[in-house]
């Protein structure tokens, strides 16, 4: 649509942009792990951060680039630098001036849907979900075992070969749900809340 701007007039142009990855259902073509039509339709409603969380403290969080590992967070907690948890969604701390609002740590069910829509192939130290060119790339960032410090900035176990992505759902007792990825595997498991795992934020979940 062409708009004619007249001399002597004042105009305001408002630009709206959405950060993140969101695919239409018919673009979700990685179905080798049991991805269903329902999974595709539900995933199409979500927008994903393009990188893992990479911030310390408790305010103005950012996410990193798509291939960077980011930092490691205990279950449903902002960055603590140790094995403590604080019952705070770290995705809620993303800088709203830049990213907007509504970001959350994914639910167990959302990560389960995502885990089904992949070819389970580890490539370039990570795994593609939904689509291998325009989909979601999750680095195999490893994790931080709780006896090696929990939350922190560097992996202690499995970097480049495994990924451990936090959900926001408690599995009871000392464990919580997360998504595990390694070559040939993408699935939901439950493990220690005190471990440091990566976080990929989502909107619409």
Give the role of each language-model region.
Residues 50-60, 65-75, 83-89, 93-104, ...:
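C-terminal, surface-exposed recognition/capping segments
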Residues 4-6, 42, 154-155, 190:
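Generic structural signal for short, flexible, solvent-exposed coil/loop and linker residues
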Residues 1-38:
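Extracytoplasmic cysteine-anchoring/structural motifs
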Residues 78:
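Extended carbohydrate-recognition surfaces in non-catalytic/accessory domains of CAZymes
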Residues 41, 47:
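Extracytoplasmic/periplasm-facing segments of secreted or lipoprotein envelope proteins
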């Amino acid at each position: 649509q062409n708009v004619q701007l007249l001399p002597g007039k004042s105009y305001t142009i408002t630009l709206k942009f959405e950060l993140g990855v969101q695919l239409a259902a018919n673009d979700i073509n990685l179905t080798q792990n049991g991805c269903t039509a329902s999974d595709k339709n539900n995933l199409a409603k979500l927008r994903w951060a393009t990188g893992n969380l990479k911030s310390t403290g408790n305010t103005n969080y950012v996410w990193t680039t798509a291939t960077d590992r980011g930092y490691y967070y205990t279950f449903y907690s902002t960055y603590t630098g140790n094995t403590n948890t604080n019952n705070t969604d770290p995705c809620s701390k993303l800088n709203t001036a830049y990213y907007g609002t509504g970001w959350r740590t994914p639910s167990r069910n959302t990560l389960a849907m995502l885990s089904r829509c992949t070819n389970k192939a580890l490539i370039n130290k990570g795994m593609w979900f939904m689509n291998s060119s325009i989909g979601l790339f999750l680095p195999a960032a490893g994790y931080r075992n709780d006896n090696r410090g929990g939350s922190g900035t560097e992996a202690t176990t499995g970097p480049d070969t495994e990924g451990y992505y936090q959900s926001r759902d408690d599995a009871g007792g000392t464990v919580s749900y997360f998504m595990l990825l390694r070559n040939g595997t993408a699935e939901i498991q439950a493990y220690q809340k005190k471990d440091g795992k990566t976080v990929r934020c989502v909107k619409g979940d």
